[in-house]
Amino acid sequence: MKRVVLLIVVAGVLLLCVVAVLRKGAPRPVTAQPPVMPAPPAAVTNAPAVSNAPPISYVPPLAATPVEKLPKGWEDFRKLREIGQLNRVTAAMENRTLPADLLAFFEKEIFNRQHWDVTRNNMANALVWQESPNPRLHELFAKMLADETESPVWRDYCLQFLSECMKSSSDPEAIKSLLARYAQGKDGLAGTAIVNIGLQEGAGRIKPDETFSQQLEAQLTDPEVVIPTKLSILGMIGKRHDVRLLPLVRSYATHTNDSLRRTAMATLGLIGTRDDLPLLQPGLTNRNRAVQMAAKGAMARIEAR
């Protein structure tokens, strides 16, 4: 009986040991961790801006560049090279009834100094040669003529076109005044103005008084007047048959400048007398062929009268 009880006790002790071993190797339960709370946000304050920070200014959006509206059939004009633009304008120049939009374009584009002078010249021709030109076209040429930043060549062109406008102008008196004013100068423009006064006189649109002849005399004796203008004056004296100035013309028939000399000889051929033949004779053997021809032609005209 004692042996049985002892075995039961031993068995119980062994069972407890096994249970203890099993519990020691078993996984431990995961204990719940407290949640991690985010840090509270920093308080927002109305702190002033840093003093050296650049101010933020409003920049409006860029306005769209307006698209230039060119005349019908001329949409590619800006893309052409200058020679192409010249050819396009020259072709239009021959049309005496150009559409209004193209004429308006020429009246603005003629101020564009990026064009060759010949291109601008042909635009002017197109405007002036119309069957019914703008009666105020002279104002356009007067404006460019007065602009001293324009080239001398282009201002000379403008003076000629200004004169050309007289026959269709709404204000021919304004053109007469401008021609008269520029004719009194000492530069090349004066010569151009004088020639055009003569042309308009021949057309019956201008009738210069005696003071014009006196002006020509004063300019021809003025050493500061440029040679091209004196050439124009000598030619004008012959064209107007201004025999009052014949003695002055004779003085130029022996001038050392060949251009002045031959022009004076040509004028003597128009208004000179047989008394001028001895004056012209030396010109026949002059070294300059042009002077020889002028002397020969003048003598032939005088002898034919």
State the predicted function of each range.
Residues 60-75, 97-111, 132-146, 168-183, ...:
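Amphipathic alpha-helical scaffolding segments comprising HEAT/armadillo-like alpha-solenoid repeats
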Residues 1-4:
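Positively charged n-region of N-terminal signal peptides that target proteins for export
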Residues 16-18, 124, 253:
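Sec-dependent N-terminal signal peptides of Gram-negative exported proteins
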Residues 58-63, 78-97, 117-133, 153-169, ...:
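Structural detector for internal amphipathic alpha-helices that build alpha-solenoid repeat scaffolds
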Residues 81, 114-116, 149-151, 185-187, ...:
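Short inter-helical turns and helix N-cap capping residues of alpha-solenoid HEAT/ARM repeat scaffolds
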Residues 24, 29, 34, 53, ...:
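Positively charged, low-complexity intrinsically disordered regions
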Residues 7-20:
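Hydrophobic membrane-insertion alpha-helices, especially the h-region
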Residues 25-68:
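Juxtamembrane proline-rich low-complexity "stalk" or linker regions positioned immediately after a signal peptide
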